[in-house]
Every structure is written in C-alpha cells, then in structure tokens.
UniProtKB/Swiss-Prot annotation:
One of its GO terms (molecular function) is metalloendopeptidase activity. Acts as a processive, ATP-dependent zinc metallopeptidase for both cytoplasmic and membrane proteins. Plays a role in the quality control of integral membrane proteins. Zn(2+) binds at residues 425, 429, 501. The keyword Flavoprotein does not apply. It comes from Halothermothrix orenii (strain H 168 / OCM 544 / DSM 9562). It is found in: Cell inner membrane. The lineage of its organism: Bacteria, Bacillati, Bacillota, Clostridia, Halanaerobiales. GO terms for cellular component: plasma membrane. This is ATP-dependent zinc metalloprotease FtsH. Keywords: ATP-binding, Cell inner membrane, Cell membrane, Hydrolase, Membrane, Metal-binding, Metalloprotease, Nucleotide-binding, Protease, Transmembrane, Transmembrane helix, Zinc.
Length: 630
C-alpha cells in the first residue's frame, strides 16, 4: 500500500510537470505569431508598413486577429505586430490606398490548456498529500515517529564472547556477575543480593568498551539494544524523553536484555548549566533516563550498560547507587594485553615466521585495542602493496612508523643544508637519550620527512610506566632539548625545527612545578586548582590561579631554571661526545635511517657491516659516560 501511494503521488507530480512544459511550448505569445522564415524581412516596422502603403508599394495584406499584419514587399514577406488600438487607423489607411485586405483568426491553444490554471494546483496538492502520508507511515516515518527509540536490536549475526576480548581479566571478572545474573537471577535473589542496575564503562577512546558490552550480551545470550547518547535529543521539545520511555518499553518486552548507551556524556552531562540557563530538552531527556533507571516503575531483567570517556562531566544522580552504581575502568592495555589483542587480530591473516608479537607489543606503548587493530590492518595493506604472500616483520615495522608519525615523504625534495640540519638535530636527541640513565633508548632515527616533521626519533621504553620520577622527567626534558643544543653547537645556528620540542619541554617543566610539587623553592605544593563551575552543556574543567603575583613570578623562574639546567646538561653531553655525533651524522646523511643496533655500533666506534668508519676521536672527547649528574 505504501509503495502504491508513493507511485501515485510520483506520477501525479510528473503529469503536472508535463502539462506545464507543454503549455510553455504552445504559448500563444505574439512572438509565435510572427514568422521567422529566412525570406522574411527582419527589421520591418509598423512605420515602414504605413509609408509603403501610402507609396502604393503594397497591394495586399493579411490581418491576423488584432495583433499582426503580414504581406509581401519587394518579393519578400513581412510580418509586423501591431497594437490593437491602431487597427482602426490602419484599416482606414489600407482602404484609402486601395489595398486588398484579408483576415485570419488568431491562433489559439488547445482546449485543455485553458483548464490548466485550475487543474494544476489541485494535482500538486494531491501529490503533496500522498507524499506526506507516505512519509508518515511505515518504517521510514519521520513525522509521527519522532518519539520512537532509535535503538538497534542486535540479536543475530556473529556472536561476540569474552574469548574475543584479550586482556582486561579484572574487567571481565566484574562483568561476569552481570552475565550470571542474566543467566540465573534466582541464585542472587535467594541470597538477597541485587545485581547493579547499571554498569558504566569508563576509559579512553578505542579501548574496547563497546566490544565488552557486546561480549556480555553474547555470553548471556540475551537481546542487546544499542543506541548512542546523541540519538535521544532532536530539535523538537519532548522527543528525547519520549524516546527514553520507548527504549525501556522495548527492553521490557524483550527482558531479560541489555540496553547499551554509547557516548553517555552526550545526554548525561550535569544539569543546571551556567549562562543563559540549561539545555531544557537535554535535561528533560536526562530526567526521564533517571526515572526509568530507578523510579516507581520496576525494570526487572533490564541491565543498562553505558560507555564514556568523560565521567567527570556526568550528572551525580546518574552515578549514585541504584543507577550506574558500578564503574568499570577500561584502561589502555599493557604489554601482555597488547600481545593478546594483536594475536586476536592476526587470527585470519597469513603471518610470516619472523613476526614476533612480543617485540611488536613492546614497540607500541600507549596503543589501545583500536590502535592494535589498525596496526595489523596497515601491515596487511603494506604486504599486499608489496605483492607478498605473507605479512612480515618489515611490514609491521613500517606500519608502526606510519601509525605513529604518518607515511614517509620520500619524494619530498630537501636541500643538502636542510638534510644536514635535520641530521644534527635528530642525532642530538638520539645521543642524549642513549647516554642518560633514565631516558628511553632510541629505537630508530630518520631524516626522511614524515607528516609535518623533517625527521623523527623513535624511543622505545623498557617497560610500561604508570608513574615517573623527578629524574626521569628531567632526563626527558634534556632529551627534548638535545636537538636544539646540537644545532647550536655544531651548526652555530638554531632553527624553527625545535618548536615542538620546546613546547613539550616547557609544558613538562611547568607541570613539575605546578602539579607534581617538584620545585625545591616552592616545595610540595599544587599551584592552581580545578573548579567545577558549570557552563552550557555541562562542566568545564579549567585551571584557575589560586596564588599571588609573587608566586606566579617564582613559578616562571623555576620553570626557566629547569629548562636552563636541562639545556646545559644536553650541551655538556654533546660537547663531550663530538666525534660520536659526527660519526652518526655522517652515516645518517648516507643511509637516511639508522636502527638501534646501528646507532649503538656508531656510539661505540664500531664499523657498520663492512663499511669503514673514521674512528678518530676529538681531543676534547672523554670516555663514554652515563651522565648521572643531577
């Protein structure tokens, strides 16, 4: 029926347009009366007609209605439009000149065009009515079904279980209770226990929060409703609250089930915004969600799961016991977790024997589950591009570089001066990093441009770090300043290439003083506080000054002192190892990329493969040291 109505409306509109086009072509305008044949005199005017009639040069004319006169002059036809009020005078002139007068009726349009002005609006209105009725009915409705929930029921297709989720053993243990409740609720009710009504998954983007929710539904074997927080709010008032009610009505019909709300912060931000009042529609939606989760109406058998990476902006009423009373932190995986995740993503991929998953996991600190999936996919794409049958370790190495720093711009032309500048800059980073005790060791350095950088240094930490000591922070700042120091010492000039290094070093130094309490002069203080004043759509967390101008000046002095101290350390290391710098730069300009093994050989003065290396040492170079000075 819907298709029939849709087709009827379409054909009615098509017929109306056809009539409109036809009327355009049969228009009875004066211009269609005037002949445009090649034998017709083009610039024949009404005045010419009168003059030639008076001179007796025209013997016969034909008057077409009261709008035009045609005839023959000098063996050529003319066709002249005339104003209706001039017809009587023209007739008198023609009779006086004894011109033979003929008449023809004015051409008229077909009979049906006269009715067009009445029929066309009616046809268009009927077509519009059919179109609106079709849009109001069925699954494609957007008029009368605004209040319907947009949640998608995911109960068919590939089943996801906890076996598909690597790492997160503690998280899966927490969620296993939810699975047990959905499978066997009587076991809990006999003990008087209540399973949490809501489970909030908190963690950075890409850590697998949605995958965990799907795994819970897959393990329990229950319907799984998924909806985004932004799907609740529309431009019409009351739509969001109506959709929340409809969502829970669907859940009750399919209980036991799981309702998963992704990006909860889109609808669950704290109420009572600042300037101009709150977002009324979003707050009504949130209020309805609070009522449905723990109100007068029981929702037995429905477990609400949600995911967010901004738990700090959520309304406290959402997080209280009885609603989202259990928060499960889904953090970035460690080395073991990255190994497990990568193995899962390599299940259906042909992998060469030289691929070491443990090495890849160690080389990717800070990568999330989504990052590891992207890494495996990029490696597979590179293998296909290189026409290989299996994915090799080389493909993974290049994929890691591409994911971290972007694709190499091998076609970009750099002058010899720029290549030399980048080589000294990256060598400064690498050598300082390898000679400091608490700095991360260099995995690779390159002068091939990537992204917006002219060169790169890849550092490989020995292990995942949850905390950093003061000495580790100082060494990290020293490594960041090593590039600028190398430019200054060996090129006797500095460039804009160190801009990002200086920005990161300054940020770290200021954090040491204002956040970590590592300033000797100011002591163990946190300077600046986070306040919870609300702005539109939630809370804005910003750092406010809670100290005097004198303390602010001391902070600037302390930050400057840390930067100066670390810069002097970097200069000292490079000045004591000038020959090593020159060897590394020479090989870097030749090879463009050096790995950790090659770099260590150059630092020790050993040749690379069969290449001979000038092992001469600068007279000012001291023996290699570990630079443990504080």
């Amino acid at each position: 029926m819907n298709n029939f109505m849709k087709n009827i409306g379409f054909y009615l509109v098509l017929i109306a347009l056809s009539i409109l086009v036809a009327q355009f072509f049969v228009d009875t305008d004066v211009n269609t009366i005037v002949d445009t044949d090649v034998n017709t005199i083009k610039d024949f005017t009404y005045s010419d007609l009168i003059n030639y009639v008076e001179q007796g040069k025209i013997n016969e004319v034909t008057i077409i209605g009261n709008e035009a006169v045609k005839g023959t002059y000098n063996h050529r036809e003319f066709n002249v439009p005339i104003p209706p009020e001039a017809v009587p005078d023209l007739m008198a002139e023609l009779r006086e000149a004894d011109v033979e007068i003929k008449t023809e009726p004015e051409p008229t349009a077909p009979w049906w065009t006269g009715m067009l002005a009445y029929i066309l609006p009616i046809i268009l209105l009927i077509g519009a009515w059919f179109f609106i009725m079709q849009r109001m009915q069925g699954g494609g409705s957007q008029m009368m079904s605004f209040g319907k929930s947009r949640a998608r029921l995911s109960e068919n297709g590939k089943k996801v279980t906890f076996e598909d989720v690597a790492n997160y053993e503690e998280v899966k243990e927490e969620l296993q209770e939810v699975v047990e409740f959905l499978k066997n609720p009587d076991k809990f009710t006999r003990m008087g226990a209540k399973v949490p009504k809501g489970v909030l998954l908190v963690g950075p983007p890409g850590t697998g929060k949605t995958l965990l929710a799907r795994a819970v539904a897959g393990e329990a074997g229950v319907p799984f409703f998924i909806i985004s927080g932004s799907d609740f709010v529309e431009m019409f008032v009351g739509v969001g609250a109506s959709r929340v009610r409809d969502l829970f009505e669907q859940g009750k019909k399919n209980a036991p089930c799981i309702i998963f709300i992704d990006e909860l912060d889109a609808v669950g931000r704290q109420r009572g915004a600042g300037l101009g009042g709150g977002h009324d529609e979003r707050e009504q939606t949130l209020n309805q969600l609070l009522v449905e989760m723990d109100g007068f109406e029981p929702n037995e058998g429905i477990i609400v799961m949600a995911a967010t990476n901004r738990p700090d902006v959520l309304d406290p009423a959402l997080l209280r016991p009885g609603r989202f009373d259990r928060q499960v932190v889904v953090d970035k995986p460690d080395v073991k977790g990255r190994m497990g995740i990568l193995k899962i993503h390599l299940r259906n991929k042909p992998v060469a024997d030289d691929v070491d998953v443990e090495v890849l996991a160690k080389r990717t600190p800070g990568f999330t589950g989504a990052d590891m999936e992207n890494l495996a996919n990029e490696a597979a794409i590179l293998a296909v591009r290189r026409r290989k049958n299996k994915i090799t370790m080389e493909d993974f190495d290049d994929a890691i570089d591409k994911v971290i720093a972007g694709p190499a711009k091998k076609s970009k032309v750099m002058s010899e001066r720029e290549r030399k500048l980048v080589a000294y800059h990256e060598t400064g980073h690498a050598l300082v990093g390898d000679l400091l005790e608490h700095a991360d060791r260099t995995h690779k350095i390159s002068i091939v441009p990537r992204g917006r950088a002219g060169g790169m240094r890849w550092a490989l930490p020995k292990e995942d770090k949850n905390f950093m000591s003061k000495q580790e922070l100082l060494d990290q700042i020293t490594v960041l300043l090593g590039g600028r120091a190398s430019e200054s010492i060996f090129l006797e000039d500095i460039s804009t290439g160190a801009q990002n290094d200086l920005e990161r070093a300054t940020k770290l130094a200021r954090a040491m003083v204002t956040e970590y309490g590592m300033s000797e002069k100011l002591g163990p203080l946190t300077l600046g506080h986070k306040h919870d004043e609300q702005i539109f759509l939630g809370r804005d967390i910003s750092r406010q000054r809670n100290y005097s101008e004198e303390i602010a000046a001391e902070i600037d002095k302390e930050v400057s002192s840390i930067i100066e101290y670390c810069y002097q350390r970097a200069e000292k290391i490079l000045q004591e190892n000038t020959a090593k710098v020159e060897r590394i730069v020479r090989e870097l300009l030749d090879r463009e990329t050096l790995d950790a093994e090659q770099l260590q050989k150059l630092i020790k003065g050993e040749p690379l493969d069969d290449d001979s290396i000038d092992n001469s040492t600068d007279e000012n170079e001291n023996r290699e040291h570990e630079n443990n000075d504080k």
